[in-house]
């Protein structure tokens, strides 16, 4: 009987330890996961142009100008391209489109097609850009061009979006926000023209995915 009683005590101690150590282990794991998430995020500022950046960062005018010019070049390479001005205006609004440089990412056959139909192809103006904090350290900083539509019918209306259609909120420069580091990664060059309304569809899909991800995160945190 004593032996049996000893076995029962041992089982109880093991069971108690398992029940009480498991939450601790989970908590430690959660802390490391949260730390990993924090490291994967980056604080960025949103500016309309180099002057906005310089005003917010006195003494950093040269860096602001460099970031702005780099963002313009990136916009030429990655912005949605349209075969006609009308298609671009339908998406982004009057006065928001420009002729794109022939070498701006487009494949030669698509350049020829666009040039045959209208003499050139079109892209939206860069409405602003995201820029990593100047005091963030490391070898320089990253920037990402942003676009915005002035057509109320477009899903991108009044919003800052990147070339992939991801939404970064209201098109109001001067804001600071936290984004995943992947948001600042260079986007692939645009190699084909977009049909009318195609970019808006991308923005709508991205917004749906963002809302879904936010909802899942909220439910997970709430248990």
Swiss-Prot record:
InterPro entries associated with the record: Biofilm_formation_YgiB (IPR009576)
Composition bias type Low complexity, residue spans: 178-195
Bias (Polar residues) ranges: 204-223
Stretch list, region Disordered: 178-223
Family: Belongs to the UPF0441 family.
NCBIfam families hit by this protein: PRK11653.1
Name of the protein: UPF0441 protein YgiB
Source organism per UniProt: Salmonella typhimurium (strain LT2 / SGSC1412 / ATCC 700720)
